């Protein structure tokens, strides 16, 4: 009986508490597009990563893949006898014969490490390039969604970005307050050796990591689009949307990486077939279903822990964009706590 009374008392106490633990929005937000890498908004699903720059006229979405590296497997026994040079190197160092030590260390150095490679950049170019107002770019930490809002020629535009782990893709949803107001061109580029093709409403970029084509990890990036109203046409190297009310851009990628100890070409994974399968699956997706799966998966991890450093919901979120909060850190206690929570 005493235990039951204690349980009821605890429940009543919790119900009577004010909602001071409610968190302010867990968002980073800015009033201008990103001009540099450090200003972009990162998204990722554990394999694919994306950086959102958010320029309304030419939006760059810089993408990478966890498995895209330079180099090839190395024989683990290649430097098996390297340890015998260590005493000689130490002897040279103690004798301050640094030139000799430097030459001897070549016997134990082995091959250079592989380099992590950039993948591609997806450009969303607005055909109606003109002045924009009411700009806002944000990243929601509690949903792993990025947004860009702006106004052009009396029309409000919104772009929503996500990197889905369940569906292994990156998606961008374009919408506008006025029907048939979206006019954009989609292109793919890469700093690596590559070629771009279009077919059946699909944009494809294939290439390989730094090095010889027959020795390097290969990759295939595909963009597909679903849209409402308007038209979707293709040039040799781009997809063009005209008079569209709403569109979803799907990006998928696969590489020939097949394990750290397997050659990426001779024993590589079937990256072309896998990318084509991913693209076909993406084209059958409804964006709302994709979003629900993404949120359920992400929040399963993010919601395990929450942090509150102050009572009440801070007004600092609405008062100042994140870069201004950083510059004013140390001058407003309430805002400092909110920034630290972020």
For the regions a language model picked out, list residue spans one by one:
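Bacterial Sec-dependent N-terminal signal peptides
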Residues: 1-23
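Aromatic-residue-lined binding/catalytic grooves and analogous aromatic/hydrophobic interfacial grooves
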Residues: 22-342
């Amino acid at each position: 009986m005493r235990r039951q009374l204690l349980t009821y008392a605890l429940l009543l106490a919790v119900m009577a508490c004010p909602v001071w633990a409610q968190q302010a929005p867990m968002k980073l937000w800015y009033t201008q597009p990103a001009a540099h890498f450090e200003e972009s908004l990162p998204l990722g699903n554990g394999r694919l990563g994306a950086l959102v720059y958010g320029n309304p006229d030419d939006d760059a979405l810089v993408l990478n893949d966890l498995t895209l590296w330079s180099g090839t497997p190395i024989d683990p026994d290649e430097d098996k006898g390297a340890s015998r040079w260590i005493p000689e190197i130490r002897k040279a160092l103690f004798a301050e014969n640094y030139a000799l030590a430097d030459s001897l260390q070549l016997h134990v150095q082995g091959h250079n490490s592989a380099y992590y490679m950039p993948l591609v950049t997806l450009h969303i170019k607005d055909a109606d390039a003109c002045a924009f107002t009411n700009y806002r770019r944000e990243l929601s930490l509690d949903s792993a969604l990025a947004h860009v809002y702006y106004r052009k020629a009396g029309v409000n535009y919104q772009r929503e970005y996500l990197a889905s782990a369940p569906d292994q893709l990156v998606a961008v949803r374009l919408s506008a307050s006025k029907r048939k107001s979206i006019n954009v061109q989609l292109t793919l580029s890469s700093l690596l050796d590559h070629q771009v093709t279009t077919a059946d409403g699909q944009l494809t970029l294939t290439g390989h990591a730094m090095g010889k084509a027959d020795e390097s990890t290969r990759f295939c990036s595909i963009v597909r689009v679903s849209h409402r109203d308007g038209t979707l046409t293709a040039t040799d190297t781009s997809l063009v949307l005209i008079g569209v009310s709403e569109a979803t851009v799907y990006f998928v990628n696969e590489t020939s990486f097949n394990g750290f100890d397997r050659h990426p070409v001779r024993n590589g994974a079937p990256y072309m077939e896998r990318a084509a399968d991913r693209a076909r699956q993406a084209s059958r997706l409804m964006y709302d279903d994709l979003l629900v799966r993404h949120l359920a998966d992400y929040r399963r991890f993010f919601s395990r822990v929450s942090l509150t450093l102050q009572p009440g919901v801070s007004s600092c979120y609405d008062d100042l964009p994140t870069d201004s909060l950083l510059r004013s850190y140390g001058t407003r206690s309430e805002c400092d706590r909110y920034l630290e929570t972020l």
